[in-house]
Every structure is written in C-alpha cells, then in structure tokens.
Swiss-Prot record:
PANTHER family with a match to the protein in the record: HEAT-INDUCIBLE TRANSCRIPTION REPRESSOR HRCA
Repressor is among the record's keywords: yes
NCBIfam families named in the record: hrcA
Database matches in Pfam families: HrcA
Annotated TM spans: none
Keywords: Repressor, Stress response, Transcription, Transcription regulation
Top-level division of the source organism's lineage: Bacteria
The protein's name: Heat-inducible transcription repressor HrcA
Classification lineage: Bacteria, Bacillati, Bacillota, Clostridia, Lachnospirales
Family named by the database record: Belongs to the HrcA family.
Provenance organism: Lachnoclostridium phytofermentans (strain ATCC 700394 / DSM 18823 / ISDg)
Record-level Gene Ontology MF annotations: DNA binding
Gene: hrcA
Cystines in this chain: none
Role played: Negative regulator of class I heat shock genes (grpE-dnaK-dnaJ and groELS operons). Prevents heat-shock induction of these operons.
HAMAP family per record: HrcA (MF_00081)
Length: 345
C-alpha cells in the first residue's frame, strides 16, 4: 500500500523527532512538530495505520512509537534531504601523516569516527582485475629459478620453480623476452591455449619451463590478498542507550575486532540506496547478527581502474543519515583528489 501525503508527513515527523531525541514519539509531539493542523485523535488514528502497515512500532514500556526497520528504509530511500555538512577539510589532515597507504587508511578511519561520532572501518585496496604488468625470471641455483610477477596495482608475487637442468644467461634472457612479449597487460582469462602454444614454440626446447612459469602466473593472479581492516571509534557506539546493553555491547565490540565478520559485512552488495556508491543497511539487512540493532553505511573508494576498497560507518538505527551520507560524499571527493594526483605523478 502506498502511503498518502498525510501519512508520509506524520511518519517523517516521527522518524526525525526520534532521530533527534531517542525517545518514543506520541501524537501530541507530532501535532506540535508538523504543520498539518490535525487533532491528536486524528494523528493517533494515522499512527495506528502506520503501525499496522509495519512502519512504526510501540516499545513495551512506552505509549509513544518509534520507527521500524521498514520505516527507516522508506525514510532513507525517499525522505532524506540533501545536507551540506560543514566537515573540516580532511585532505590536508589525511596527507599530513600519510607516507604510505596503510597510514592513510588509518587516518581515514580515525577522522570519520571523530566527525560522525560513530564506529568506522576501512578495508585495504582489493583488485577486481589482475593483469600482468611485468615478469622477470632469474636463476636461484642450478635446480631452481625465481619468477617475479608484478601485477596491476604494483602487487609483487615471487614464485620459486624447480627446473630439470640449469639455464644459462642467454636462455634466461630469451625466456624473459618471450614471457613479457606475450603476457604483459593480460589477465588470467586472456591466457588461452593458442597463446600458450605460441609461447612454447618461441621457447623451443625450454617449453616445459614456460608451462611451469604459466602455472605460477595463474596462481599469482588467482591468489586472494590478505585484506586489512582498520577500525576506529568502537566505543562511540556505547554512547547510545539502545546499544549499551552489556550483552549486546560486548557482542558488538567483539564483532568490530573480528576480521572475518567485518569482511563479510563490507563485501555485502545487497542493498538499495544507490547514492554515489553509498549503501545503507538497516537492522536485519546487515549480514552480521550482532549488528541487527545497528545501521551500517558503506562507500567504495577507487585508487585506479580495478583497484578499490570499502569504507563503513556503524551506529544506531537512529543515526543521522543525512550527515553520514554527506560526510562520506565529502570524503570520497577528497580521496579521489588524493589518488588522482598520486596516479598523475
């Protein structure tokens, strides 16, 4: 059932009042909060309909109402207003100590926690497509060669390969030329049988070594990197009464230290709310059990084509969604600027 304008305005008033106060909202509060000029009795009837439709619920201990997950979802998808958040310019602060990517991402998590007053998390970059940038084969000893594989994003993989007989310098040089000529700029799906056949023909009597090197390349491209997750502001969430229950709080704090669950959360793609790549998960939409009383807002940052990571903000379901989305948009613009300048060097 589609809500009429009156119900939408009342629902919006309930949600906004609850976001501000954290207290259940009654009909008298709504009559003062809106310009509908409705009696308390009429508002009560409308609230009863909204409750029956699943947009608001009544806590056991209160006569007022609070938004349900369904109500929050409607608010996030259709009622949020563009909000210009006066966030301090993060760019200079991010660059101040960001001598390497790890430090930059730690700074991102810390500054977001300070600016939003929620818990934050940032993943290290991941790679959607892994293309071969450069290969180098060198001798370790008479029975082994070292294959250095540089992938897109400057990921370096080292593979030791056993060989049946020693390779002289001329042969190693020839192998390096053949490998780089055929493989540079390709990903695993592009290394087909016809290409392998051509490479083996070029390598002549050393075709078996080429096969072993190709196996090493395929393994390097397919390997998953160890994703790092940087968190900050975990204790911020304890400031909100609905999240400071001892048992729930301890589970939530444990989750924020549990890498596997955070990785599942950050890699979850099921959500609406496509706002410049920003995703909003509310209550039961989150894939992590201990976060069913939370809202999670995530965004994707991109360093270069195919190289991306995730940023997440965790708070109560009554979080200031407009501020969080605006802050993330602001941050994404500043990160884009930082990464663009790095790539232009």
């Amino acid at each position: 059932m589609q809500l009429d304008d009156r119900k939408l305005k009342i629902l919006q008033a309930i949600i906004r009042n609850y976001l501000e106060t954290g207290e259940p909202v009654g009909s008298r509060t709504i009559s003062k909060y809106t310009d509908l000029n409705l009696s308390s009795a009429t508002i009560r009837n409308e609230m009863s309909d909204l409750e029956e439709l699943g947009y608001i619920i009544q806590p056991h201990t209160s006569a007022g109402r609070i938004p349900s997950d369904k109500g929050y979802r409607l608010y996030v998808d259709t009622m949020m207003e563009d909000k210009v958040t006066e966030v301090e310019n993060m760019r200079d602060m991010l660059l101040e100590k960001a001598d390497k990517m790890e430090t930059l991402l730690q700074q991102v998590a810390r500054l977001l926690a300070v600016n939003t007053n929620y818990a934050t998390m940032v993943t290290s970059p991941q790679y959607r497509s892994r293309k071969v940038k450069f290969l180098q084969v060198s001798e370790v000893d008479t029975t082994q060669i070292l294959t250095i594989i540089v992938l897109e994003g400057n990921i370096v993989k080292n593979k030791i390969i056993a060989i049946a007989e020693p390779l002289d310098k001329e042969t190693l040089l020839k192998l390096n030329i053949v490998l780089n000529t055929f493989l540079q700029g390709l990903d695993l799906s592009e290394i087909n049988l016809a290409l392998i056949r051509q490479m083996k023909e070029q390598a002549a009597e050393h075709s078996s070594v080429v096969s072993d090197i190709l196996d090493a390349v395929a393994q390097a491209i397919s390997e998953e990197d160890d994703i790092q997750i940087f968190t900050s502001g975990a204790t911020n969430i304890l400031k909100y009464p609905e999240l400071n229950d001892m048992e729930k709080a301890s589970e939530l704090l444990y989750t924020l230290e549990e890498k596997k669950q955070l990785t599942n959360l950050m890699n979850n793609e099921v959500s609406s709310g496509e706002n410049r790549g920003i995703q909003v998960y509310i209550g039961n939409e989150t894939p992590v059990d201990s976060m069913k009383d939370c809202a999670v807002v995530t965004a994707t940052y991109q360093i270069e084509e195919g190289v991306y990571g995730k940023i997440g903000i965790i708070g109560p379901k009554r979080m200031d969604y407009e501020k969080v989305v605006s802050t993330l948009q602001n941050l994404m613009c500043q990160l884009d600027d930082i990464f663009k300048k790095d790539n232009d060097r």
